[in-house]
Amino acid sequence: MSNLLLALNIDHIATVRNARGTQYPDPVYAAYIAEQSGIDGITVHLREDRRHITDRDVKLLREIVQTTMNLEMAATDEMVMIACQLKPHYCCLVPERRRELTTEGGLDLIYQIDKMQNIVLKLSDAGIRVSLFIDPDIEQIDASYKIGVRCIELNTGKYAESKNKEDRILEYRRIEKSIKHALSYGLMINAGHGLNYDNVKFIAMLSQIRELNIGHAIVSRAVFCGLPKAIKDMKELLKEFRKKDDQ
């Protein structure tokens, strides 16, 4: 049985901090607590408008994170420069729109393969492992392979937000098909977006997925039971469901 890794997105800790313009709660301290609680990695999105995570946060996180740091970022010159200076373990290129509450969908790579190839090359030359956040779509996977990344993160948002069983099954089949196609290229597969304690089960049972990125659900539960307990609960679910896939 392959272990399913869990990375915690701590953007939402920073959102609470910035709502009142205080210095607390500190997402850097949250990362420390998360690692002490068994998390496998820390994910942060440094947005162009710095609405939650700040430059100060990412600099300190790079110094203190002992597992892996995954920097989500837009494909801009500014972010590439910051990433090359910071040298996180991973960078995940994501789409970014100023008015969105959270990332609304995956990258559309079809007409920007050359641009993405150049960005991936710069990041790779800096020693950073690069992934692309894409929808579960065959053409996007083909484009990812052409761009030259070794890892993709499949957007589980439509699956997670499905309003009925039929739609959820349809989206799940798309994810399954996309995983099979990505594996034919030898790509490593992560997944995330919108996953919570109720809908994560069937995604966790897909044994080809290496890591899940989950933030809002864990931080929300932590408000009531604490971050260590919220992480423990999610990790136990992932372990239980991954075992069921092997039975």
Swiss-Prot record:
Site (Transition state stabilizer): 153
Catalytic activity: 3-amino-2-oxopropyl phosphate + 1-deoxy-D-xylulose 5-phosphate = pyridoxine 5'-phosphate + phosphate + 2 H2O + H(+)
Keyword Chaperone in annotation: no
Residues reported in the UniProt entry to bind 3-amino-2-oxopropyl phosphate: 9, 20, 194, 215-216
Pathway(s) served: Cofactor biosynthesis; pyridoxine 5'-phosphate biosynthesis; pyridoxine 5'-phosphate from D-erythrose 4-phosphate: step 5/5
Functional description taken from the UniProt entry: Catalyzes the complicated ring closure reaction between the two acyclic compounds 1-deoxy-D-xylulose-5-phosphate (DXP) and 3-amino-2-oxopropyl phosphate (1-amino-acetone-3-phosphate or AAP) to form pyridoxine 5'-phosphate (PNP) and inorganic phosphate.
PANTHER family: PYRIDOXINE 5'-PHOSPHATE SYNTHASE (PTHR30456:SF0)
Name the record gives this protein: Pyridoxine 5'-phosphate synthase
Source species: Blochmanniella floridana
Gene of this entry: pdxJ
